[in-house]
Amino acid sequence: MTILPISAFSDNYIWTFIDKIAGVLDCVDPGESAPIIRFAQSNQLTLRTILLTHHHYDHIGGVDSLIKQWPSCKVYGPIDERISNLTHPIKQGQSVQVGSLHFHILFNPGHTSTHISYYEPQQGWLFCGDTLFSAGCGRVFDGTIEELHESLLLFKKLPRNTKIFCAHEYTLQNLKFAHTVEPCNSSVINYMQQILKQPSPCTLPSNIDLELSINPFLRTDKEQVKQYALSHGANSSDSLDVFEVLRNQKNSFK
């Protein structure tokens, strides 16, 4: 089985698992249907499973058309009235079998109130939707900043070699903000230079080890990150206070 990012909209990735021997593919958060249909038809594949992380349209917008094309397709996602056509509503603590892959469901509210991620421990894969980005994290919509903070603390506990399959290509812009927070962080500087030199615009998947060195939202315990937050209105150097200031500053960062 191989993993391929199929581009959608301006910066979305629809992560796709391809099993050519079985003649099937599975995908995560298909915000658009056309790219998946084109790929499947050109490779003579049948869509078997859709995994959804949350209700935002750029993650679920293609589902209706895809299940019309493949009526037997299974659709997994969080229990949320804003998501229709789920064949398998799932909760935290449940698991999902997709071919040979066995995903653990992680409840990661914050970006939204019902956001989930799919973690495959044997492969070391994390499909985290909009909760964690490379060098960044999602905005808070109908979740809370406290929930988002806890969700990222959970990710910090995963094995360092865990690959992170984010849903958007935001890495370069996130690194610019990370450099503002930690201008002396050589890991941020070096990674930004590496990305600017590489021929492909795709910077994903990332991994936990890299993110712990470049992502300010995972580095709220670092002195320079604390000082940045305190200088921008943090009430204290506690992790949550630092995290909240970082998120607020990133919201308006150009």
Curated annotation (Swiss-Prot):
GO molecular function: hydroxyacylglutathione hydrolase activity; metal ion binding
Enzyme Commission designation: 3.1.2.6
Catalytic activity as recorded in UniProt: an S-(2-hydroxyacyl)glutathione + H2O = a 2-hydroxy carboxylate + glutathione + H(+)
Binding site for Zn(2+) 1: 54, 56, 111, 130
GO terms for biological process, alphabetical: methylglyoxal catabolic process to D-lactate via S-lactoyl-glutathione
Cofactor names: Zn(2+)
Pathway listed: Secondary metabolite metabolism; methylglyoxal degradation; (R)-lactate from methylglyoxal: step 2/2
UniProt keyword terms in alphabetical order: Hydrolase, Metal-binding, Zinc
SMART domains referenced in this protein's UniProt entry, alphabetically: Lactamase_B
Any Pfam family the entry gives: Lactamase_B
Assembly mode: Monomer.
PANTHER family, sorted: HYDROXYACYLGLUTATHIONE HYDROLASE, HYDROXYACYLGLUTATHIONE HYDROLASE GLOB
Function recorded in the entry: Thiolesterase that catalyzes the hydrolysis of S-D-lactoyl-glutathione to form glutathione and D-lactic acid.
HAMAP family with a match to the protein in the record: Glyoxalase_2
Protein name (database record): Hydroxyacylglutathione hydrolase
Gene this protein is translated from: gloB
